[in-house]
Amino acid sequence: MKYYLCKFVPPRADFLPTMSEKEQQWMKAHGAYLTELLDQGLIVAHGPVMDPAGGYGVSLFQIPDDQDIAALTSKDPIVLNGVGHYEHYPMLHLTSRQ
């Protein structure tokens, strides 16, 4: 297994409070996509971070060795629509509640 902390970086610091209607739709699809990966056991947890300098998203991934983290995050609807990007940080291990 491989483990990653993934940070979703929105296109602007004030993205969350200033989303257009289309961006709101894409964010809803983004949340549904991450929850689907959670249900598949590929994500351990995900959610928004309310940083005063600008909000962003964090996801903890636990994926099989033969899967590519960039391939998974590139299929996120918000990324497919050109709104923001992911940063991927490998972790040595991940311990979580069962």
Give the predicted meaning of each segment.
Residues M1-Q98:
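Conserved, structured core segments of small domains
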